[in-house]
Amino acid sequence: MALDKDLASIQEARELVSAAYSAWQLWSKASQEQVDRVCAAMAEAAFGAAERLGRMAQEETGYGVAAHKKLKNEFASRNVWESIKDIKTVGVIGRDDARKIIEIAWPMGVVAALTPSTNPTSTVIYKILIAVKARDAIVLAPHPSAVRCCYEAASLMAQVAEANGAPHGLIGCMQNISLQGTNELMNHKYTAVILATGGTPMVRAAHSTGKPAYGVGPGNVPVYVDRSADVEKVARYIVASKAFDCSTICATEQAVVADMPIGNRLAQLMQEQGAYFTSESESDLLRTLLFNPDGGMNTATVGKPAITLAGMAGFSIPNDTRVLVCRLNRVGKEEPLSREKLTTVLGWYDANGWEKGCERCIELIQFGGRGHSLIIHARDDQVIMAFGLEKPVFRIAVNTMGTLGAIGMTTGLMPALTLGAGGVGGSITGDNITTYHLFNVKRLAYELSAPPAAALIPGEPVAGPGAREIEAVVRSVVEEILKIR
């Protein structure tokens, strides 16, 4: 008799984790040369399959643009591998002769990796590379709407890894997805660490297991455009960034905060790039379409082109429209469009001066993107530094596309598709998660100085009262109590 879906999912999780643990016991003894050979081969194979996997991801999920998913797959393979290939993850990885410290890498074990529907194959490629480079095993749990493409990406990398000497079972991917199966994966006794990329409920579940977990927070990313900015460049960047893969990367700009002296010019230039500024009635239609009564986003609108959204909402726009822009004046529950919008809809706020712009950005971050990211366009270094010092976020991308800058494609940040939101955002780190986060470091610490003399002198023994003394005290107390009565 066939198992029901939940039981089949639980059993699959158990089998994959057990196989991964057995494989990890072998892989943990691999040399640096073996690790790097396997990872390089996987990165090359994934890069070569980027177009096919991108097309599969778009067709299966219905989100985004296949050509942009291809670029994300190339980033997850080429850029991520280039950033970690020279990192030592085996044996002695560091020496400090002055402090007499020797550092030794130690793998964590089995990584339970939860992946989203918005960036499915690219996240699979990235997580496998950073885990295997750290000498970990990995078992992936894809989003239910992206199982086929994720399994294809994981299978490709597993086959290449095994062909280059990695043990069978080192890389696993669930196909029978259920809440119960995912919970079994995260809570399994052999799971060492959880790497969760996805919605807030999933990340909270990962943090509630009692296991070490790297999770992400929501990214309600504001972009401040200062009067000192190169406005023509900014207009190109904002529209291109928001339209990239139909805004499915969590670091995508969610609201423009425009310094008033350049606001009209910026709006005009963005229109020339394909931005359509909605009327108030059209904005109302989008509010109703994009968000459910409970405030959650309508998943049918995620990752959709602007022309599709307008049609769903019930109004017409030019066929060459890339982004819908809604002018807003409030932030909070009473303004749904001030939330994160993983689709081609962008908020717009006017601000008179960088101080007011700073305040508005903080409002947006506190409402839905604490710890995540912020974008600033300015040529005034004092304004840029003021934003860096005051904003409760851990990535501030300067004069670049938010989508590509925050993940490390166009900046010096570590290339990553899991972006920590720090303590203020409910994460353990504000880093772009990479292979460093998936192995521990042991330290040999040699004596630098002799211990203080007082630490070597035997202390006088401290003798407590004996049994007879205690009995006498108790008897005396009891007698006093009886006298009072």
Please annotate each region the language model reported.
Residues T89-K233:
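Rossmann-like NAD(P) dinucleotide-binding subdomain of oxidoreductase/dehydrogenase enzymes
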Residues L16-S18, G215-G217, C246-C250, E335-L342, ...:
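Short, flexible turn/loop "capping" segments at secondary-structure junctions
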Residues M1-I102, I130, E272, I484:
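N-terminal Rossmann-like NAD(P)+-binding subdomain of aldehyde/semialdehyde dehydrogenases
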Residues D6-L7, I125, V203-G332:
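ALDH superfamily catalytic-core signature
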Residues A2, F315-R485:
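Conserved C-terminal structural/oligomerization subdomain of aldehyde/semialdehyde dehydrogenase
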Residues S28-E33, P167-I171, F244-C250, Y276-R287, ...:
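Flexible, glycine/charged-enriched surface loops at secondary-structure junctions
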Residues Y21-S28, A112, A255-A258, L342-G353, ...:
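Short, well-ordered beta-strand elements within core beta-sheets of diverse protein domains
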